[in-house]
């Protein structure tokens, strides 16, 4: 079927693509095997190799699973851009859970929606943002609150 925008489409590009069958976690694991000592993250002059990144993600994923996170569970991720955000994101994926990204500028009233709408029970955040998330959780009925923050 010819869509209206296809008449402007470059001839060398296909109209559709088939996404790869590998997950983001698989891509990280493959990179960690191929390039264990290569830099994966560089942040304020500190470097984390692919092997170190994978190990940190595996540890946090195991922690999430020990808290009861199961396949398909939603986990809030409320952080500024930093290596811990990347580690937490991949760890949630490794635990077969779903990442629910949260804008760190949100306040308690807005955060309540992030907790209740996806039915999240676990959140990963930093100390500077934990107060707002805790206030949001505490303002909810007991059955809707976060179990782990």
Where on the chain are the PLM-derived regions?
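Structural core segment of the AMP-binding/adenylate-forming
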Residues: 66-67, 94-149
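A generic short-segment signal for beta-strand/edge and adjacent turn/coil regions
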Residues: 7-12, 45, 91-93, 116-121
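Conserved AMP-binding/adenylate-forming core of the ANL superfamily
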Residues: 16-21, 29, 37-82, 86-90, ...
């Amino acid at each position: 079927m010819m869509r209206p925008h296809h008449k402007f489409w470059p001839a060398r590009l296909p109209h559709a693509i088939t996404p790869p069958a590998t997950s983001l976690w698989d891509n990280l694991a493959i990179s960690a095997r191929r390039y264990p000592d290569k830099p994966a993250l560089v942040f304020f002059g500190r470097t984390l190799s692919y092997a170190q990144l994978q190990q940190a993600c595996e540890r946090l994923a195991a922690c999430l699973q020990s808290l009861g996170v199961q396949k398909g569970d939603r986990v809030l991720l409320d952080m500024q851009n930093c290596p811990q955000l990347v580690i937490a994101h991949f760890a949630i994926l490794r635990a077969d859970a779903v990442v629910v990204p949260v804008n760190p500028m949100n306040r308690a009233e807005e955060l309540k929606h992030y907790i209740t709408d996806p039915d999240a029970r676990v959140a990963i955040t930093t100390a500077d943002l934990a107060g707002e998330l805790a206030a949001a959780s505490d303002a909810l009925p007991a059955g809707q609150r976060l179990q782990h923050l």
